[in-house]
């Protein structure tokens, strides 16, 4: 095994680290509990609609 074959993984992941680093500074921070509550409420809303329509 040559050392050149292992360097490709590090080079490709370095760009991803830089990309996600810049995304974190500008991203809107939403609490995971808020997302979960929205999903549960949306599911309840869909169930109520399916009961009233059918």
Swiss-Prot record:
Q: Which residue ranges does UniProt annotate as crossing the membrane?
A: 32-53
Keywords annotated in UniProt: Cell membrane, Membrane, Protein transport, Translocation, Transmembrane, Transmembrane helix, Transport
Q: How does it sit in the membrane?
A: Single-pass membrane protein
Q: Where in the cell is it found?
A: Cell membrane
Q: Which residue intervals are topologically Cytoplasmic?
A: 1-31
Q: Which is one Pfam family of this protein? A: Sec61_beta
Please cite one Gene Ontology biological process associated with this protein: protein transport
Record bears the keyword Signal: no
InterPro entries, per the entry: Preprot_translocase_SecG, SecG/Sec61-beta/Sbh
Query: What's one GO-annotated cellular component?
Result: plasma membrane
Extracellular side of membrane: 54
Which NCBIfam families does the entry link to? PRK01253.1
What function does this protein fulfil? Answer: Involved in protein export. The function of the beta subunit is unknown, but it may be involved in stabilization of the trimeric complex.
Assembly information from the UniProt record: Component of the protein translocase complex. Heterotrimer consisting of alpha (SecY), beta (SecG) and gamma (SecE) subunits. Can form oligomers of the heterotrimer.
Task: Describe the family membership recorded for this protein in Swiss-Prot or TrEMBL.
Answer: Belongs to the SEC61-beta family.
Q: State the protein's name.
A: Preprotein translocase subunit SecG
Native species of this protein? Answer: Halorubrum lacusprofundi (strain ATCC 49239 / DSM 5036 / JCM 8891 / ACAM 34)
Q: Which gene encodes it?
A: secG
